[in-house]
Amino acid sequence: KHTLPDLPYDFGALQPHISAEIM
């Protein structure tokens, strides 16, 4: 798990974006 705060919205929608950031 990465250092991220508990997001109030659906985190699943951000997963693709997060993956792109890590890459």
From Swiss-Prot:
Substrates-to-products reaction catalysed: 2 superoxide + 2 H(+) = H2O2 + O2
Xref: InterPro entries: Mn/Fe_SOD_N (IPR019831), Mn/Fe_SOD_N_sf (IPR036324)
GO cellular component, as recorded: mitochondrial matrix
Keywords (A to Z) from UniProt: Manganese, Metal-binding, Mitochondrion, Oxidoreductase
Keyword presence, rRNA-binding: no
Pfam families linked to this entry: Sod_Fe_N (PF00081)
Family the UniProt entry places it in: Belongs to the iron/manganese superoxide dismutase family.
Subunit organization: Homotetramer.
Name of the featured protein: Superoxide dismutase [Mn], mitochondrial
Origin species: Aquarana catesbeiana
